[in-house]
C-alpha cells in the first residue's frame, strides 16, 4: 500500500506540546478516502498501475467520456483521478477504499502542493537580489536587477535568467516530513513543520521516496526516558 498516495486539504497550522516541554509546529491536513476506479494490468498497457478517485463532483459537470467510465465501473463520480504504478495489482480490487490506515507504519512522507501566488514581483522580492546602490549616481533603478545580457556576442538574454515576473503558484514537493500523529476517526493527518499553500490547498501525501535513518520526536523522547531509567556506570 506504500506505493499509492492520498489527497487531502490543508486546514491550517497548530502546535503540539510534549511532556518534556518541547513545542513542535504542526500542519493539519483533512484527508479524503481514495476509491479504486480501475486496475491496469501489464498485458493491456505494458505496465501495472492502479487508478484512484478522490473527492465528490456533480454528474452534470462530467464529460461524456468520464460519465461512460464511471457507468462502466458502476461507481459514483469522483472529482479527481490519479494513477499510481504498483508492483502487484492483486492487492487492489475495483471499488475498494483506502484511508489514513495506509500510513499506520509510515514515519515520514512526501507532500506535493501548489505554493501561494504572489502575483508579479520584482527581482529583489522574487530572487532575493540586493538591488543597486542607494546613492552615488543611481537614479530610478534602485530596485532593478541590473544587466540582463552581454554585448554583441552572444547578443541575447539566456533562458533562465533571473528577472522580475510571476512569483508563486508553482507545484512544489516537500520531502521527509515527519508524521506527528493520525486521527483516523476524523480523517486528520498531523505533519511536522509547514507545507506550501494556503488554506484548502489540495495536498498529495505519499510515503517518502528517500529512506533515511532518522528518529522521530516520539522515539527521541522514549529514548531519553529510557536513558534516565538506566543507572549511569560512571557515577559511583
UniProtKB/Swiss-Prot annotation:
Q: Which residues form a coiled coil?
A: none
PTM note says: Methylated by PrmB.
Ranges annotated as spanning the membrane: none
Q: Which Gene3D superfamilies match?
A: 3.30.160.810, Translation factors
According to the UniProt record, one GO cellular component term is: cytosolic large ribosomal subunit
* Task of the protein: One of the primary rRNA binding proteins, it binds directly near the 3'-end of the 23S rRNA, where it nucleates assembly of the 50S subunit.
Protein's recorded name: Large ribosomal subunit protein uL3
Gene for this chain: rplC
Amino acid at each position: 500500500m506504500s506505493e499509492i498516495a492520498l489527497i487531502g486539504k490543508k486546514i491550517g497550522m497548530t502546535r503540539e506540546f510534549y511532556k518534556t516541554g518541547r513545542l513542535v509546529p504542526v500542519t493539519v491536513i483533512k484527508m479524503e478516502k481514495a476509491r479504486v476506479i480501475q486496475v491496469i494490468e501489464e498485458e493491456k498497457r505494458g505496465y501495472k498501475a492502479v487508478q484512484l478517485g478522490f473527492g465528490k463532483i456533480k454528474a452534470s459537470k462530467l464529460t461524456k467520456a468520464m460519465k461512460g467510465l464511471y457507468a462502466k465501473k458502476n461507481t459514483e463520480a469522483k472529482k479527481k483521478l490519479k494513477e499510481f504504478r504498483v508492483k502487484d495489482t492483486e492487492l487492489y480490487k475495483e471499488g475498494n477504499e483506502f484511508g489514513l490506515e495506509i500510513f499506520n507504519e509510515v514515519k515520514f512522507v512526501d507532500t506535493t502542493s501548489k505554493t501561494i501566488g504572489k502575483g508579479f514581483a520584482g527581482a529583489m522580492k522574487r530572487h532575493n537580489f540586493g538591488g543597486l546602490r542607494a546613492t552615488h549616481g543611481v537614479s530610478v533603478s534602485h530596485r532593478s536587477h541590473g544587466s540582463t545580457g552581454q554585448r554583441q556576442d552572444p547578443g541575447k538574454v539566456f533562458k533562465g535568467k533571473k528577472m522580475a515576473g510571476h512569483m508563486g503558484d508553482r507545484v512544489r514537493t516537500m520531502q521527509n516530513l515527519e508524521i506527528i500523529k493520525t486521527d483516523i476517526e476524523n480523517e486528520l493527518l498531523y505533519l511536522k513543520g509547514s507545507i506550501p499553500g494556503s488554506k484548502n490547498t489540495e495536498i498529495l501525501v505519499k510515503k517518502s521516496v528517500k529512506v533515511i535513518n532518522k528518529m522521530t520526536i516520539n522515539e527521541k523522547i522514549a529514548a531519553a526516558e529510557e536513558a534516565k531509567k538506566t543507572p549511569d556506570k560512571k557515577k559511583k
